[in-house]
Structures are given as structure tokens and as C-alpha cells.
């Protein structure tokens, strides 16, 4: 069965602006459970991870806000957005003047969401479904990471790859509300925001969320 991922994204979301970044419009779900179930039905699988692409997570919102408020962070730079989800952070980077953005996510629904969201915001991104953590670090100036330290294995792989990037002189910025495996001892806080989020996804309606630099 061939799945039209873009059609699924459009059919199961509404065009909304994340609370912290009203400049950006994304195809987002109103509730977590219905779209989660529909994703499982569409793929004929159960036990799938949440459709991360369908929500504006706290870390991504904070990182997007920081990029938009401090455009010199990305101005004229080659940027990678790791584990892009909706593509929100990459879109923010292009809006703030990045030379280029490569948005990466292994979920094909995410790839479709990034495409439709980029068009919605009139920006052009490069997109890949390759797992960049298994690849050599690309020749870029900046890597942006939102909300990727929620699971130990992923967090360890991510940090090792980001440390390789840092060793090459690449700047690394991370948006995170204090997930369990965030390596705070390796990070320098550069900004902090109170981010409105969904109780479907989080344990509070407002998450204190920081932007960190790998130090």
C-alpha cells in the first residue's frame, strides 16, 4: 500500500501558530491521541512512537523564538535542524536569514509535514530522511536541536554526534525543557522562556524551557 504522507498531514491537522512563535504557521494536531491512533491505522502498526511532527514541542518553540529574536545566530549560515519534527526550527532559521537549512527526520510523515509547512511559510529548505547520527557530520556552521533528550539511547547517540560537530568548530544550540537525559553539565544556558504547551503532551500547561549552547 502506498501512503500519501502529505495528504495525511493535511487531512489530520489544522493550520495553527505555536503560542511562542506566532510568526510561524504549521499543520498541527489539536489532540495527541486521535492522530496517534490514525497514524497507527494508516501504517497498520501498533505501538508506534507519538507523531512528533504534529505538535509544537516546548524545546522547538523556545529555540525558534531565540533564533527569530537573535537573527545573527543564523544569519548567512549553513544550518542543520536535527530531528526536525514539524520543521518549525528550520523554518524560523530561514525566516531569520540563514543561508541554507537541512531539516532531517527519519519519520516520513515528518518529511511530508516539513514540506507542507515550509510552503505554508514561503521558505525553502533541504530535507532528508536519513539518520544523520549514523553519518559523518556535514560541513555546516550551526546545528539546531529541539527536544531530543527524552530517551537515554537517543540522547547518548545525539550527544556523541554533536560533540563530533563541536570538535569541527560547528556551533550547537539545543532547546529543551529539562528532559530526563539532557546533559546539563556540558551545556551553557543562553536564554529561557515560559512556553505554553498541551496537557496532552506535558505535565503542565506552561513549561520553563531553556536554549543551551554545547560548551
In which residue ranges do the predicted regions lie?
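S-adenosylmethionine-dependent methyltransferases
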Residues: 1-215
Amino acid at each position: 500500500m502506498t501512503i500519501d504522507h502529505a495528504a495525511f498531514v493535511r487531512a489530520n491537522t489544522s493550520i495553527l501558530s505555536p503560542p511562542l512563535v506566532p510568526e510561524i504557521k504549521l499543520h498541527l494536531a489539536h489532540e495527541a491521541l486521535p492522530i496517534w491512533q490514525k497514524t497507527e491505522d494508516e501504517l497498520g502498526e501498533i505501538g508506534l512512537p507519538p507523531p512528533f511532527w504534529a505538535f509544537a514541542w516546548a524545546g522547538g518553540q523556545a529555540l525558534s523564538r531565540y533564533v527569530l529574536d537573535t537573527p545573527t545566530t543564523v544569519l548567512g549560515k549553513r544550518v542543520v535542524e536535527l530531528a526536525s519534527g514539524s520543521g518549525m526550527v528550520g523554518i524560523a532559521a530561514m525566516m531569520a536569514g540563514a543561508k541554507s537549512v537541512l531539516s532531517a527526520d527519519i519519520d516520513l510523515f515528518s518529511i511530508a509535514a516539513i514540506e507542507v509547512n515550509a510552503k505554508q511559510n514561503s521558505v525553502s529548505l533541504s530535507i532528508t530522511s536519513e539518520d544523520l547520527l549514523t553519518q559523518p557530520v556535514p560541513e555546516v556552521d550551526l546545528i539546531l536541536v529541539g527536544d531530543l533528550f527524552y530517551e537515554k539511547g537517543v540522547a547518548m547517540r545525539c550527544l556523541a554526534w554533536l560533540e563530533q560537530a563541536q570538535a569541527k568548530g560547528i556551533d550547537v544550540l539545543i532547546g529543551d525543557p529539562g528532559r530526563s537525559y539532557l546533559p546539563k553539565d556540558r551545556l551553557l544556558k543562553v536564554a529561557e522562556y515560559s512556553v505554553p504547551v498541551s496537557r496532552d503532551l506535558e505535565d503542565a500547561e506552561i513549561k520553563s524551557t531553556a536554549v543551551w549552547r554545547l560548551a
